[in-house]
């Protein structure tokens, strides 16, 4: 998804020297220790965005990854930037179980109200929903469920829904009419805000959500 951003930033010779980035999540263990290598989101961001930008890239000191020691610094850093006039843009996808970042639906049951839930800035070593693991096996691990970590570090509602603007994408369509994301998209847009469906708060933010036509339905059985 970064290919065109890289293309136009380089074509127009636009510098990212005033851009600050905060990766929303990272694979981790129960203690928040993160993975390295090709499967990590840090590696993906560096290889798809930062490195291809060359001289136009985001300064290294402005790059934030959801590591155990760095994730807790996000609220203060973001608040300071916003106080200085920065705009916070949320770039997101919608998970199979309607998570944003890795803020899973079952976390909602831990709180007595949406207001309390909305005040959570991040979580280290969060346990992932089984369908989240299966989704990532399909999309990122070439079907190898056993390679997908069961936990992750993630930002929470307090940070994601403080965004001034949101840009989302839903492209969970496979071949021959198969897909995994249609119901998740419908729930996001039609259910109404609730802490039990994280992405249901997305329509409360200004922004744009791009989706593939087939995800819009009808969501009817079709033998493949």
Each PLM stretch: what is its role?
Residues 96-99, 107-108, 174-175, 216-217:
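Short, catalytically relevant binding-site loops at active-site mouths
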Residues 12-89, 146-147, 211:
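Ligand-binding beta-strand-loop-alpha-helix segment within the catalytic cores
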Residues 85-91, 164, 207:
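Conserved acidic residues
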Residues 104-140, 145, 187-202:
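Gly/Ser/Thr-rich active-site loops/lids in small-molecule metabolic enzymes
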Residues 154-224:
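ATP/nucleoside-binding phosphotransfer catalytic cores, i.e., glycine-rich phosphate-binding loops
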Residues 2-37, 86-87, 100-127, 150-151, ...:
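Active-site histidine-anchored catalytic micro-motif
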Residues 122-163, 168-169, 181-182:
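Catalytic cores of processing enzymes, dominated by hydrolases/peptidases
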Residues 1, 92-96:
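Glycine-rich beta-strand-to-loop/alpha-helix junction loops that act as flexible
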């Amino acid at each position: 998804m970064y290919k065109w951003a890289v293309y136009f930033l380089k074509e127009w010779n636009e510098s990212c020297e005033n851009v600050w980035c905060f990766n929303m999540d990272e694979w981790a263990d129960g203690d928040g220790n993160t993975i390295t290598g090709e499967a990590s989101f840090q590696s993906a961001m560096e290889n798809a965005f930062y490195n291809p930008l060359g001289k136009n890239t985001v300064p290294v000191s402005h790059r934030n990854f959801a590591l155990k020691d760095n994730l807790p610094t996000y609220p203060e850093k973001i608040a300071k930037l916003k106080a200085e006039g920065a705009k916070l843009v949320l770039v997101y996808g919608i998970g199979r179980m309607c998570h944003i970042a890795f803020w899973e639906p079952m976390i909602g049951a831990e709180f007595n109200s949406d207001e309390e839930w909305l005040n959570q800035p991040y979580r280290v070593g969060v346990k992932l929903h089984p369908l989240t693991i299966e989704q990532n096996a399909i999309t990122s691990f070439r079907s190898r469920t056993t390679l997908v970590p069961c936990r992750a570090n993630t930002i929470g509602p307090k940070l994601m829904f403080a965004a001034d603007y949101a840009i989302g994408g839903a492209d969970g369509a496979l071949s021959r009419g198969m897909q995994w994301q249609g119901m998740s998209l419908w729930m996001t847009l039609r259910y109404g805000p609730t802490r039990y469906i994280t992405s249901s708060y997305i329509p409360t933010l200004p922004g744009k959500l791009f989706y593939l036509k087939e995800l819009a339905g009808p969501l009817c059985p079709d033998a493949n």
